[in-house]
Design a protein with these regions (language model features):
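Short amphipathic alpha-helix with an adjacent loop that forms part of the alpha/beta core around
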Residues: 33-40, 109-110
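A structural micro-motif
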Residues: 27, 67-69, 90, 116, ...
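A conditional alpha-helix N-cap/helix-loop micro-motif detector
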Residues: 98-101, 134
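Non-catalytic C-terminal accessory region of glycerolipid acyltransferases
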Residues: 4-8, 105-218
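A transmembrane-helix-recognition feature enriched in membrane-embedded lipid enzymes
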Residues: 1-34, 81-90
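Catalytic core of membrane glycerolipid acyltransferases/transacylases, capturing the structured
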Residues: 39-99
Length: 218
């Protein structure tokens, strides 16, 4: 019943928010290979994305319109009302970065095992002004992907929201097969580290591809 209510509320928000988000973001979607991975996601998957703004979440909702995204969210967002209630109704996965509570990982794995799509921002926070982007990735996304044995879909956004001169650009990458990083000859930590590093490299590569596409169109 709770899952049905979450999916209903997501659908309501996306239908009623479609026009406002078109005006606010004007999102242009590019693809690494559309024949392999477009906007439709079949079966369980993890979406990873670079993190530029709290509005990254909203953009992902509409990029992958046909699926209900269960996105990991920091505790600070749930502490602000009525935002916290809204995110809870949207099915946000509570992540408390100030404690050693890893229940969000079990919750994410459980959702994936029932065919759902989980969204993760592996940087775990917004970069500061002078920090190199993307920030180093936390290992939890790789751990969950390997444990649940699901593909990882990388997404890069330029973070240009509410900008009349420059629209939002998003590029969807081809899925990463976690089996390529699950080597029985290595330790669990080594496999997690390999996948974590590979995910960050894919995000960086997608960012460069998006920049190249933008330069070609000038």
């Amino acid at each position: 019943m709770k899952i049905m209510l979450t999916e209903f509320f997501n659908t309501f928000v996306k239908v009623t928010g479609w026009l406002p988000q078109k005006i606010a973001f004007r999102t242009k979607i590019e693809y690494e290979d559309k024949a392999v991975q477009g906007r439709r996601i079949k079966g369980p998957a993890i979406i990873i994305s670079n993190h530029t703004s709290v509005f990254d979440y909203a953009v992902l909702l509409f990029v992958f319109f046909t699926r209900t995204l269960r996105v990991q969210m920091a505790e600070v967002l749930f502490q602000k009302q009525p935002l916290g209630l809204f995110l809870k109704m949207m099915g946000g996965i509570y992540v408390n970065r100030d404690t050693h509570d890893f229940s969000f990982m079990g919750k994410s794995e459980e959702l994936l095992r029932t065919g759902k799509v989980v969204g993760i921002f592996p940087e775990s926070r917004l970069p500061l002004k002078n920090e190199e982007r993307p920030l180093p990735f936390k290992p939890s996304a790789a751990y969950i992907a390997l444990a649940a044995d699901v593909p990882v879909i990388p997404v890069y956004t330029n973070g240009s929201y509410f900008n009349l001169k420059k629209r939002a650009h998003v590029i969807i990458g081809t899925p990463m097969n976690v089996h390529d990083f699950a080597d029985d000859a290595r330790s669990e930590k080594e496999n997690i580290d390999r996948l974590t590093n590979a995910m960050r490299e894919r995000i960086i590569r997608l960012g460069r591809m998006l920049d190249d596409t933008a330069n070609e169109k000038k």
